[in-house]
Each structure stands twice: as C-alpha cells, then as structure tokens.
C-alpha cells in the first residue's frame, strides 16, 4: 500500500540538513548515508549519495528521473552468482 498523500514524502531530517549545508557552501561532496528509506526530493538532484547496502557504500548520483523514489532502490543488497550447474550432465 502506498503512503498517504496528506503525510508527504518521508526523508530523514539530517539528510535535508546535509544537502542544505552543501548547497550553501557550493561544494560537491558525497553524502554518506545509511538511510535507504528516504525519498528522493527535487533538491537532491545533482548530488551524489553513498548509500549503504549492508556491506559497503554504493555511490548514487541523483538525476531528475529518480525524484519520488527511495535511495535504497539504487543500491542493491543481494548479489546473484548464477544458478547451480546441472550435476546429471557432468556425470556422463
């Protein structure tokens, strides 16, 4: 079920503060975050976030098409190593 419109998008408060500080200073640093649940806002466009995937930080550079989605959608948590080989074929 989607979030109610009257509640608005969820973003951790410290994330907005970090973006505003970088906007004032004019620097283009990576913003390190564990907040995969935060929604991407229009003020985030052009910034690069390091989003934690449980093991390491994945760099995510935000563009206009990402607005409204979550930061965690762009740093996958699982790696696919392929299906196991068919053991019946190897025996022959």
From Swiss-Prot:
Q: State the Pfam families in the record.
A: Ribosomal_S19 (PF00203)
- At the top level, the lineage of the source is Bacteria
**What are the entry keywords?**
Ribonucleoprotein, Ribosomal protein, RNA-binding, rRNA-binding
Instruction: Tell me yes or no: is Ligase among this UniProt entry's keywords.
Output: no
InterPro entries recorded for this chain?
Answer: Ribosomal_uS19, Ribosomal_uS19_bac-type, Ribosomal_uS19_CS, Ribosomal_uS19_SF
One GO MF term, please?
Answer: structural constituent of ribosome
Which BP terms in the Gene Ontology apply to this protein? Answer: ribosomal small subunit assembly; translation
One cellular component GO annotation, for this chain's record?
Answer: cytoplasm
- HAMAP family xref list: Ribosomal_uS19
Function comment:
Protein S19 forms a complex with S13 that binds strongly to the 16S ribosomal RNA.
NCBIfam families under this entry? rpsS_bact
Q: Which family does it belong to?
A: Belongs to the universal ribosomal protein uS19 family.
What is the recorded name of this protein?
A: Small ribosomal subunit protein uS19
Gene field:
rpsS
